[in-house]
Design a protein with these regions (language model features):
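Short, small/polar-rich loop/turn modules that mediate ligand/substrate recognition or access, typified
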Residues: 181, 186, 242-244
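Canonical Rossmann dinucleotide-binding motif of NAD(H)/NADP(H)-dependent dehydrogenases/reductases
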Residues: 13-44
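Substrate-binding pocket helix/loop in short-chain dehydrogenase/reductase
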Residues: 104-105, 112-114, 200, 212
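Residue(s) in the substrate-gating loop at a strand-loop-helix junction
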Residues: 149
Length: 256
């Protein structure tokens, strides 16, 4: 559960007054990012299909929740627009929503391929288009942070359409950086490694956790807070000259 955010925000909060849209912000990495940004003074709108969790986290972060089915491109566009309009604009977009369906390439179906790309990549394009139009109209620039995966760089046997969909996220983010940089908009992707979210902790054995931890020179799995900390840097003015990058958050499992 994402902890409640205190209302005692200092003037030095790194994201004071910033308006943020977070897809997949009901739990996991997206939920942690939403909470971290809110704690730094941002106003956060969470987009997710998980209504109860989404409302709970929105209440905890002092933000708003918008139910969305990212498989539906029309609903994705209209819901993103509603979130932007509810805040009077958007300064930061975080695309964290994604799905992973385990299957071999030989057993991968067209439906699984299409649905994975629809949620992991196509919906990301839609939320960016809506948000960037608002950013350009406002004339103040903006920040785009897209969640990819280390699977985008190293693949993943048995992970179906997930690795290629995340590789597409990296390429899409670089295109965004190239096309929208002239408007003062930066775009970067994060490539997390093995992150122990609440859902992952409930479904993995200790043996799994120990094995995956051994892949990192640091000897542990990542936490959602590890990814949120890097996302906060990308959302802050400290990263204003950083764009088009695919940043590993893998504890050294991937070193390029």
């Amino acid at each position: 559960m994402v902890p409640p955010v205190t209302s005692d925000r200092s003037e030095s909060a790194r994201l004071a007054g910033k308006r943020v849209v977070v897809t997949g912000g009901a739990r996991g990495i997206g939920g942690e990012i939403a909470a971290r940004f809110a704690a730094e003074g941002a106003r956060v709108s969470i987009l997710d299909r998980l209504v109860d969790l989404g409302r709970e986290h929105a209440s905890a972060t002092g933000g708003s929740f918008h139910e969305v089915d990212l498989l539906d491109p029309v609903a994705t566009a209209s819901t993103t627009q509603a979130a932007v309009d509810s805040m009077g604009g958007v300064d930061i977009l975080v695309n964290s929503a994604g799905i992973l369906r385990f299957t071999s390439l030989l057993d991968l179906t067209v439906q699984d391929w299409n649905e994975t790309f629809s949620i992991n990549t196509r919906a990301m394009l839609t939320t960016m288009q809506v948000s960037v139009r608002a950013m350009i109209a406002a004339g103040h620039g903006g920040k785009i942070i897209n969640l990819a995966s280390m699977a985008a760089k190293k693949g993943g046997a048995g992970e179906g359409a997930y690795p290629p969909s995340k590789a597409a996220v990296v390429a899409l983010t670089r295109m965004a950086a190239l096309e929208w940089g002239c408007h003062g908009i930066t775009a970067n992707s994060l490539c997390p490694g093995y992150i122990l979210t609440e859902m992952g902790a409930a479904t993995r054995t200790q043996a799994d956790i120990d094995t995956w931890s051994s892949y990192s020179p640091l000897g542990r799995l990542g936490q959602s807070s590890d990814v949120a900390a890097v996302a906060l840097f990308l959302a802050s003015p400290d990263s204003d000259y950083l764009t088009g990058q695919a940043i590993n958050v893998t504890g050294g499992m991937v070193m390029h």
